[in-house]
Amino acid sequence: MDAAGHRDHLIVQYHGGPGFKISPEPWSYSCILKDQWRLINGEELYDLRSDPEQRINVADQQPDIVKNLKSYYLPFWNSVSPKITPVSIALGSPTDNPTVLSSQDWYMPRGNPPWNFGQIGKLPSVTGPWMVDVQTPGLYRITLRQWPAQANKPIKAVRGKIEIAGVIRESEIKPQTLGQVFEVELPKGKTQLRTWLFDSKGNAGGAYFTDVELIKER
């Protein structure tokens, strides 16, 4: 990097995703590094030359240093915070049809979704929405599964349900069904897809693997 592009400071911003109990906000889980100074969460200042273990907060003794370090942060936050939003997965794209969704991409308000086969194999009673972007309006086939299609495993549930773009569909699942199919008309635009698979006791988990296929354009 040339001299004109060189920075004398570094900003570290940690964002742990929906597993965090609070929504991302300025200063939380942040650190600004410059020379021997470390400003934590915009409040705690440490001098690594005299205090490498960062035990003594000297923010009150060094207000000018705190002010200087804080001046770097908000322009940085304003540039990156718009990107801390759910990404919508394309449906009905000419380059990716059908779209295969997995529970790893559920957007949970708190905690993490089932994201590995060890968790999914326990058929947890949890579900969440996929943020999706219907790129082509038309008739879609939505197939609910608890395992990838390649596993060729039947659904362990008696009833399935979907909700998308204000449309709700529900139907009985017959024994040995590999994938529960719904067909719905979808308009173009961003929306959410949520799925439920109910057992005989009424407990519901989501369809951890769901295929969405555009079958007829409108």
Predicted regions and their residues:
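Intrinsically disordered, low-complexity polar regions and short flexible loop motifs
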Residues: 51
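Long, internal low-complexity/basic segments
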Residues: 58-218
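Generic recognition of well-ordered alpha-helical segments
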Residues: 34-35, 44-45, 54, 68, ...
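Active-site rim elements
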Residues: 17-19, 24, 28, 54-61, ...
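C-terminal cap/loop subdomain of S1 sulfatases and analogous C-terminal strand-loop tails that border
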Residues: 1-48, 79-83, 94, 108-109
